[in-house]
Amino acid sequence: MAQLNFGGTVENVVIRDEFPLEKAREVLKNETIAVIGYGVQGPGQALNLRDNGFNVIVGQRQGKTYDKAVADGWVPGETLFGIEEACEKGTIIMCLLSDAAVMSVWPTIKPYLTVAA
């Protein structure tokens, strides 16, 4: 583990040698990662996870960014869903919505969050 200084705060950070990609794939092999939001952060993170062999779905409401998700290869009803359905299907939920969007969507997401074991 490395200790890194982020603006005066020292953090312990797991490095790649300690947790390589193959180990991450093994740990997450039975998980479905639901990326909620396909605006600024969603595409990069969802595509990176998918390209690295993780089981990923996207939750996005209809509109321009939904169409972008389709253009990026996400398949409606298979890997692309509305927000609530993606939360229901995901075992890990990554909320990548803007702060403003989270405020309006939070009541939809909250029931699907659980305390990790």
Residue ranges and their predicted role:
Residues 61, 74-117:
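Rossmann-like NAD(P)-binding element
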Residues 2-77:
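NAD(P)+-binding Rossmann beta1-loop-alpha1 motif at the extreme N-terminus of oxidoreductases
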